[in-house]
Amino acid sequence: MLFLKAVIAILSVLPAADAAAILNFENKQGIIPDSYIVVLKNDISSDDFKSHVAWATGVHNANVAKRDVPLAGMQRTFEMDIFKGYSGAFDRATLDDLLKNEQVDYIEPDRMASAQGWTTQGNAPSWGLGRISHQQRGNTDYVFDSTAGRGITIYGVDSGIDILHAEFGGRATWGANFFNNINTDEFGHGTHTAATFGGTNYGVAKNVNIVAVKVLGDQGQGPWSSIIDGLQWAVNDAREKGILGKAIINFSVGGPSSRAADNALTAAHNAGVFVSAAAGNDGADALNYTPGTARSICVIGNINENDYRFTGNGASNWGTRIDLWAPGTDILSALPQGRYGPMTGTSMAAPHVAGSVAILMASGGVSTAEACGVLKDMSTPSVIEPGQGSTNRLLYNGSGQ
């Protein structure tokens, strides 16, 4: 790729002491040509960040004017506590100038990430609710605390949500769209995951408030830069509403490792928003992919109805980064336009945890920082053949059953 050759050429002439880190350009998976995410150093102030953005915009405009290069330049800015950066389409000269700037920590290529669920055929039963509320498999009743997550808000950072679906009982609202101007779920994945964590009939936490944050399109894909923007919006919305500590992000998205996305996820957690993240469906070590490479957040693997790690098409990732396992195979839930259907993937496992945390927050005042640990303490050692280095702990809501 031409942009990769340009980066190599730039690095060959930059003094090592002056160059910011430039990450993962040798891995071409999902790369969006000429598009970059630039992350600044942690100690930069908000005022200095604004000044830097203005400087970078000016540098780009001057460079493209000289060379008549049709690149968009600055497209998104990110400011989540100590995580500050921006994304855009920049030419070689601008990239050279950015790399030399002492405020820049690292630059990485923007890439496409994907929904982590796979649609399955058939009319599978919704067995997940019964499984997480019983210590033994095979039960169909769902036993849960009567608060059912009342007063807690879950942000579905996904493909959007069909907020008018009867499954949500008027509790779902449209938040923001960072992918296109079509404010609905074109893919189905976001509606399915939202109904799993918060649906009236198929959901874990039946009284939560649900907010749609669209970052993926009709093919279930979106750039990391859009996804980071969605994470930022969710955190800022929770802050503005005064619900930090009572807010959750369900993150059923994943893809090639992105340090910028990892840092944004960690920043969301540090701000007081719990993140339940799908481990990924590559049948590989979760540490090789985002969100598995992010720290602090809770990373969830997928089991089937017999308590085995799912190893079929779209096999669950595994490894030391898995915090918990949850039902994610043939999960029946809502789909757009009033429909219902099954899906399989770690995407379906993560919302079981998101909903369970909502109930813990509502009923017991569990904090963002301690929620994943509390669930691990409550979990049962039930998962069979979880994979090398993996925990065998299965999500359990402590119902006493």
UniProtKB/Swiss-Prot annotation:
GO terms for cellular component: extracellular region. Residues 1-19 form the signal peptide. This is Subtilisin-like protease 10. It is an enzyme of class 3 (hydrolase). Residues 20-116 form a propeptide. The active site is at D158 (charge relay system), H189 (charge relay system), S347 (charge relay system). SUPFAM superfamilies: Protease propeptides/inhibitors, Subtilisin-like. Residues 35-112 form the Inhibitor I9 domain. Its EC number is 3.4.21.-. The gene is SUB10. It is found in: Secreted. Its main location: secreted.
